[in-house]
Each structure stands twice: as structure tokens, then as C-alpha cells.
Amino acid sequence: MKTILVVDDKRVQLKTLRRGLRTRGYQVVEAISGKEALDHLIRDSKIDIVLTDYAMPEMNGIELLQKIREHNKTLPVIIMTAYGDEGLVVEAMHHQCNGFIDKPFDMDELLEEINNIPLR
């Protein structure tokens, strides 16, 4: 069973993603900030994928991606955003983002993005 670290500062979004992913057989670890996500990654080496929102206070999704890449070059990271900005996609890919999904999305779109990532 794959474990996904879901990072979003909106609790409603976390709850929705947790329910959707768990009903499809994934284990879910939640974080409400980039800092909390990094703490989880330090403590739990069993995380298979990071699914993070882009727009968060203190540390956005790309900043989180950069911090992850400083310590782990292979952990898959998918960024979710409501900003359909092509420049944002280019910047994310420059930092070795594995996937990018525009909000709003349905669970099937997210699962397709997750399943397109080869696990380390």
C-alpha cells in the first residue's frame, strides 16, 4: 500500500483528499504546512509520494519541493494549484517536480497523475 503525504493549509481540502485516497487504498499522512510536511518526512521514511498545494503561507509548494530535493532527489512530488500559470509549471519542473495538477480536479484525474509516477 502506497503512503501519500498530503500537504495543504486548508483543512477541508485535506479531509476531502484523505477520504478520496483512503477509499482507493492509499495510506494518507496529512500536513497543514510545508514545515509540518518536512517534519513528517524526517520522521517517516515510508512516505512514497508528496502531494502538496502550491499556495500556502510561510512556504509555498515549490519552496517545499526545493527543501525536499535538498535531501531526497527521488521522492515523487506532485503540486496542486488553482493558478493555471504556465510559468509556475515550468518553475516546478525545473526543480524536478514529478507532476502538476490544476484545481479543481476530480479524484480520477488525481489518481491518473499518481499512477503515472514510477515509485522509487
Predicted regions and their residues:
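Helix N-cap/capping motif at the beta->alpha junctions
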Residues: 30-39, 61
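Short amphipathic alpha-helix used as the core "switch/output" element in two-component signaling
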Residues: 39, 62-73
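Alpha4 helix (beta4-alpha4-beta5 surface) of REC/receiver domains from two-component response regulators
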Residues: 63, 84-99
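Two-component/phosphorelay signaling modules centered on CheY-like receiver
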Residues: 11-29
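Receiver (REC) domain active-site loop signature in two-component systems and cognate sites
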Residues: 56
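C-terminal output helix
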Residues: 87, 105-115
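Active-site beta3 strand of CheY-like receiver
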Residues: 45-51
